[in-house]
């Protein structure tokens, strides 16, 4: 009889211990691997993590920029084209923030600290692509969209 009662008690205790561990490590009691980046930076006292999270966001922004351009091309809305072109003009006038990050990054490419882009082995290709997109959006041609063209279809 005692063995019959101990088996469910043991299974219940084991399941509660597993659930407690899962909650502890995944929901933030100890800032486990699923904790948000802000909690890791504030509680980790490691300022180097800030640079890592900034670097991870940049490729996503480039992919979103390309996706937005394709969407605008298929939709053909002139207002979206103008707002995107204004955003590109604004970002082209700002200084490149990647130079500060590359000076800190251990794995930076050779020649990335050089301000002269023509002499660099690895020029900033993404900036050039943005300028080409900006020129393509503002250039008149067979793909030019009239403001009232969207309403005609």
From Swiss-Prot:
Residue ranges listed under propeptide: 64-153
Modified residues (Asparagine amide): 31
Signal peptide positions (record): 1-20
Keywords for this protein: Amidation, Cleavage on pair of basic residues, Neuropeptide, Pyrrolidone carboxylic acid, Secreted, Signal
Any one Gene Ontology cellular component term annotated for this protein: extracellular space
Chain positions found as Pyrrolidone carboxylic acid: 21
Tissue: Expression is restricted to 24 neurons in the larval CNS (8 in the brain and 16 in the ventral nerve cord) and 12-16 neurons in the pars lateralis of the adult brain.
Similarity-based family: Belongs to the corazonin family.
Function: Cardioactive peptide. Corazonin is probably involved in the physiological regulation of the heart beat. Clock (Clk) and cycle (cyc) proteins negatively regulate Crz transcription in a cell-specific manner.
The protein's name in its UniProt record: Pro-corazonin
Species, as recorded: Drosophila virilis
């Amino acid at each position: 009889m005692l063995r019959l009662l101990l088996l469910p008690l043991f299974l219940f205790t084991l399941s509660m211990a597993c659930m407690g561990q899962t909650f502890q490590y995944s929901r933030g009691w100890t800032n486990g691997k699923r904790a948000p980046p802000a909690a890791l930076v504030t509680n980790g006292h490691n300022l180097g993590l800030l640079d890592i999270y900034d670097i991870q966001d940049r490729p996503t922004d480039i992919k979103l920029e390309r996706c937005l351009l394709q969407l605008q091309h298929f939709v053909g809305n002139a207002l979206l084209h103008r707002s995107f072109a204004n955003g590109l003009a604004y970002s082209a006038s700002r200084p490149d923030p990647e130079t500060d990050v590359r000076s800190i990054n251990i794995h930076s490419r050779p020649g990335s600290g050089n301000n002269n882009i023509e002499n660099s082995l690895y020029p900033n290709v993404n900036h050039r692509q943005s300028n080409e997109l900006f020129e393509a959006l503002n250039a008149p041609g067979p793909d030019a969209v009239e403001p009232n063209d969207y309403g005609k279809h």
